[in-house]
Amino acid sequence: MIPRVKICCISSVEEANLAINYGASALGLVGNMPSGPGVIGDELIMKIARIVPPSVSTFMLTSETSANEIIQHHKRTLTSTIQIVDKINESSYVLIKNEQFELYL
């Protein structure tokens, strides 16, 4: 088995391209957080996500805790994956899973 590697805290298109060129399988793009490194704005997250080839996953790390906030955050960034970094209630998982996401690429 060959492990897949996610590089987190990507902060620019240049860093994203560098990680991709070195073989990253996924990129972590950190949204607004109460603390910690690597936070970038939603517009930059979307800009980076749009240049990444389909073979590389993009993770939007969100500290939002309600289903609606998480869904709205994703709609502002359009990454291929949502990474929830805080505790949310079980019903939120169901709402997020059932959301019909549309990608406008």
State where each predicted segment sits.
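Conserved N-terminal beta1-alpha1 strand-loop-helix module at the mouth
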Residues: 1-91, 95-105
